[in-house]
Amino acid sequence: MQTSYVIFTDSTGDLTPALIEQCELQVMPMAFNLDGADYRNYPDGREMSPHEFYEKLRGGSLCKTSQIPISEFVDAFTPVLEQGLDILYLAFSSGLSGTFQSSRLAVEELKEKYPARRMICVDSLQASMGEGLFAYLVAQKRLQGAALDEAARYASDLAPSDRKSVV
């Protein structure tokens, strides 16, 4: 069934490229710094594979993450809004990153230019595979034909009831 919205999430959910495609998700890559070098966490591992990343951590490398900037949300959301579609963003836990807040600020900025479009941000309260499972479950609702409000309500109900983080 055709729905009139796109689901975005971020790469900290550790979903495979195949699952991302199957679920019709748009993924925002998170930035990280490892031993002084900056990278983006793309699901396809184009800048660093998960294997290499964890090998470096086991070897004593230090990693720092940074939230997705407002400008990157604006750049990612704008083409979708210009197509006349709405947005549901499923964010990395606000307890671990400022990314959720950045997404909300981007939405406030975009509402001025696209007042007829709906943009909903939901804090997953998750990280890693817990966040990935969260995004997968919400995406399944969308694929089953759930409208934006129904999918957002499902996501909001799901978030506080499952506070586990699978590592």
Identify the meaning behind each predicted range.
Residues 26, 86, 147:
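Residue-level detector of anion-binding/catalytic polar loops
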Residues 3-4, 22-25, 114-118:
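A short helix-to-beta-strand connector/capping loop
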Residues 70-80, 105-107:
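Short, charged beta->alpha transition segments
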Residues 7-9, 66, 89, 120-123:
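General beta-strand structural signal in soluble alpha/beta enzymes
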Residues 6-72:
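N-terminal glycine-rich anion-binding loop in soluble enzyme alpha/beta folds
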Residues 1, 75-87:
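Glycine-rich phosphate/diphosphate-binding loops that line cofactor/substrate pockets in enzymes
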Residues 83, 92, 97-162:
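Active-site histidine-anchored catalytic micro-motif
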Residues 166-167:
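Conserved small/polar residues in nucleotide/adenosyl-binding loops
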